[in-house]
Structures are given as C-alpha cells and as structure tokens.
C-alpha cells in the first residue's frame, strides 16, 4: 500500500536531467499560497522520548544541537500534531480494553477518559496525569518556537469501540453509534483542558485517521478505526457543536485519508453542510507518486479550504523517495503545510534512527539532512512559487526580499543554471549566493558554501548525482 508508482510524466520529469545540463527559469508572477510551516506528529516517538530537551531543540528549533554525540542542524518544525490516546488499563463495570497481540507498548497512547460513568472532565472518570511524555514534548516544542498545534485521534477511547479494541475491526465502523457524540466530547474536552491548563491552543481538531481504510483490525500493529463517510459526517457535526459550545476557536479538519484519491472520494461524499464545517482538508502522502493531487487541490481551492499534507513517512533512509514525493506535492497538490510522521523510528522511517520501546537512539539518517534543506530555508510566511521542474521548490520572503531555491539532481552530474531575470530585481551583480549541500550518496551531510555569485540575474552551480542544494538569493523583488 506504500509502493511508489510514478506516472509516466513524473518519471520523465525526474529523469530528464540525466541527459543534459539544465537552465531553470523562476516565475515571479506565481503564487501558490503562504506557507504555514513544517511539522511532525508526536505519537509515537514522544511517548518514549518526550522528556528530552535535546530532541525538542533538534526538531523544533534551528539551533545546532548535539544528539547522541552527533551535532545536528535543527529542523525548525513549527507545527505539532498531538495525539489524543485511546488506551487505558483500568476496568469498569466488568469491561477492560482488548489489546491486539501485535501492538507494541510504545504505540499504545494513553487516553484521558477512563470510563463512561461520567462525562464531567473533573470527575474520577478522567485522569489528566497520563501521557506525561507526549505532553512534555508538546510544551518543549512550544518553548522552542512551535506555534501551530493540532489535536488528532487515531481511535476513539477503547470503551467507545464496538469490540473494545482501539486497534480496529476491519472495514466496519468500530465506534459505537451511541458514542458518536462522546467521541466529539472527548476531543473537545482535551482541547479545552489544553487551553486552560497547558496553555496550548489547538488551531484544529481532527477526529479521524485514515478512516476509509480497512486495515485497522483487532490484530493490528497500532491504534486505528474505520469510519464510513456518513459516520464521519455525523461526528464532524457533533465535534463542531462541542468545540463551539466551549467557546473554543479550534476548527474542524478532516479527514486524514491515506491517499489523495481516498481524500477526493471522502470529500465528494460529504454534503454541503459537512463541507461548510470543515475548514481544512488533511491528507496523507502514502500514495507516493500516484493519485490525483491536482484534483484534490482543485476541490479544496474551489471550496475555499486550506490543504495540508498532514502525514508522510517512508522507509527510504536516503531521503530520495521523500524528496521526490514532497516535490510532487509542491508541483500538483500545493499544500500550505507538510508534516512528517515518525521523527524517531527504525528501518528507515525515522529521521533519527531509534527504538521507541527500548529507548535507544542511534544517528540521524541521510533523510534528516535532505529534509533540513527544505525546513530550515522555506519558512512560515513565505510565498510559494511555481516549481520550474519537479525537482525544485521555490519560495519568497517579501519582508527580507530573499528568494529560496531548493533543488535536487538525481541523474548524472551536471551544472544547473538558475535564471531570475523575469523578476523586477534579480539580486545584485557579483553578490554571493549562499548555498547548502547534502549528498545522499555520501559526502556533504549539510554543509554551507559561499562560492556562488549571481550576475545579470543568473547563477550556476554544479550538482553531483544524488545531491540536494539550497540557494538563498538576497535583493530580489518579484514584480
């Protein structure tokens, strides 16, 4: 379900640089929106490592930070997705949580609402002291500069589930019909408690995670829950009411489908009332090179909705797959934010290699440094310009008159020339263009250079195969 199936056009664009040196022309008239930022989900890694100040610094600031003996450039994530857990180990009225035999303890996120005896969040049916590490990292992220927070759910509390198993029940709805509203109450109460007691204001609340998928089974490896589209619509209505009744400014985001095509189908299945409630469409990037990103963008744009790629992950530690899929998003999906899934994990998935159950850390993967090229330079508030090809992202900071270009070369070594002459002011002749280099095949991890000059609105740089570079051009006025 996570194989890479690139359409023929995208394959041609990815591979064309192998044939000849390239000139890329920047379009100063383009504008795909204001960038909201880069982010990460806290489940599951923060349950394990949420007490670590060094990890908070390396993920949420742009400071250089030593982690496990390796000095890393901070990624500067400003978006945090906090997970509302579904698990508890208590018994009530003869019922206890059913646990999948295949779920790791690190993936069982503690929930606050322990039983159905009372909906009063100040009662003994609630325990606000659980999930200490994830809550700690939430605070550390804020202290390091994170400023957009989302609350999301992978599954309702176990006792709201038909089979009392928060890992799911396959292709059938696992949320009990009499608990549709309670799932919304649970999320709204967390949002209210966070605002009052944690001083965290969730910009958005998401009640689902890949809800149309059928792989959320009782023997699954993580929390999950299938929702039919009609059930989603009902819960969305309840969630909007519960947030509003508490005087919260948090809005409803939906539906975090696994693929672009599922997101299209779900959105088209909502009636106008449900669409009016949803203020942002969240989608996951697990269709890799497939799917109609362009169609989903058109639907969101026509409806006046924001659009995020709210979760992406893959097992390619080199960062190449991530970069290619992310640039397809920039080319066709045009999200205003992009969120990685597991900051710490094994088997290529983690930006830093680690084991969330054994609490061990290794080193940063090459993927970490590839992502740093984007997150450290394309920053919140910048204007996103048209990609001159599917390997290149371009952003502009009007306040500092700085143009940021991030590009990768996956073919043979070559020289790439960047043409800024369509801009009103294309930098100063002879000015230095700082660049940062990551060589995915070995060499530079994240190294800065000052050996590039701009003349007559153009500059050139040599690229080895598998090299990602960022350039910052000062003194640029687009129009």
UniProtKB/Swiss-Prot annotation:
Signal peptide extent: 1-20
Gene3D superfamilies per the UniProt record, alphabetical: Glycosidases, Golgi alpha-mannosidase II
Keyword Methyltransferase tagged: no
Residues at the catalytic site: 210, 311
Residues of this chain annotated as glycosylated in UniProt: 89, 271, 358
Catalytic activity entry: Endohydrolysis of (1->6)-beta-D-galactosidic linkages in arabinogalactan proteins and (1->3):(1->6)-beta-galactans to yield galactose and beta-(1->6)-galactaobiose as the final products
Recorded effect of pH on activity: Optimum pH is 4.3. Stable between pH 3.0 and 11.0 in the presence of BSA, and pH 4.0 and 9.5 in the absence of BSA.
Function, in words: Hydrolyzes galactooligomers with a degree of polymerization higher than 3. Hydrolyzes radish root arabinogalactan-protein. Does not hydrolyze dextran, arabinan, starch, laminarin, beta-1,4- and beta-1,3-galactans, larch wood arabinogalactan or acid-insoluble polygalacturonic acid.
Protein name per its UniProtKB record: Endo-beta-1,6-galactanase
Phylogenetic lineage: Eukaryota, Fungi, Dikarya, Ascomycota, Pezizomycotina
